[in-house]
Amino acid sequence: MERHVPEPTHTLEGWHVLHDFRLLDFARWFSAPLEAREDAWEELKGLVREWRELEEAGQGSYGIYQVVGHKADLLFLNLRPGLDPLLEAEARLSRSAFARYLGRSYSFYSVVELGSQEKPLDPESPYVKPRLTPRVPKSGYVCFYPMNKRRQGQDNWYMLPAKERASLMKAHGETGRKYQGKVMQVISGAQGLDDWEWGVDLFSEDPVQFKKIVYEMRFDEVSARYGEFGPFFVGKYLDEEALRAFLGL
């Protein structure tokens, strides 16, 4: 039997990412005195302004989304240069007065990742650098889902030679490039960090584009044979005014 020679993908890592999904106890929130709700709002607004200042200083990015369906009400999406500032962002939200009305529904921790199957990428490349530290769009919609590469029988991604993986990913990338200008994609790796191997964020001004790109990519061999997908979350970006309206203030 021929011995399998491991050929791991070359990766570059960027910002750390936390998808923090929360449920809002609407009954408790609206039964609270207006003064208490206003105080909670002012504290939350101050926290978000701190996140905005960090983004403007190039020390991270953020987005808050109203999530459709029963899986969550809000997504607090934060990107930071390391785990420690990401933990601080999570803790600050959890210690806030607004958190008294929130419950945790799902979370995913990962690190922005760029991969090359055959040769290392140049971290100083003007093409590579911005993709390692992406800025979350401040409008439109997000679609997030975790995924794995299959390791089952003959469909074992990790047993494929690097050249074959490269060929499959190239075809997959060509499908994605059809949506350039319509969908922004951020891939983050989570091997050893969370329960799935990757997180995928899609950003668009038109949520129907999420359906189109995911459906078309399902026909790529790399997805049809080797892709395993977790839950999908779709949300609408909330600026300060929209977030306040969502909270009924």
From Swiss-Prot:
Protein name according to UniProt: Coproheme decarboxylase
Gene that specifies this protein: chdC
Protein's organism: Thermus thermophilus (strain ATCC 27634 / DSM 579 / HB8)
InterPro entries the record matches: CHDC (IPR031332), ChdC/CLD (IPR010644), Dimeric_a/b-barrel (IPR011008)
Summary of the function given for this chain in its UniProt record: Involved in coproporphyrin-dependent heme b biosynthesis. Catalyzes the decarboxylation of Fe-coproporphyrin III (coproheme) to heme b (protoheme IX), the last step of the pathway. The reaction occurs in a stepwise manner with a three-propionate harderoheme intermediate. When reconstituted with heme, can generate oxygen using chlorite or hydrogen peroxide as substrate (in vitro), but has very low affinity for hydrogen peroxide and chlorite and extremely low enzyme activity.
Keywords: Heme, Heme biosynthesis, Iron, Metal-binding, Oxidoreductase
Protein family per UniProt: Belongs to the ChdC family. Type 1 subfamily.
Domain of life: Bacteria
Catalytic activity: Fe-coproporphyrin III + 2 H2O2 + 2 H(+) = heme b + 2 CO2 + 4 H2O; Fe-coproporphyrin III + H2O2 + H(+) = harderoheme III + CO2 + 2 H2O; harderoheme III + H2O2 + H(+) = heme b + CO2 + 2 H2O
One GO molecular-function entry: peroxidase activity
Protein's GO biological process: heme biosynthetic process
EC number assigned by the record: 1.3.98.5
Residues binding Fe-coproporphyrin III: R131, Y145, P146, M147, N148, K149, H172, Q185, S223
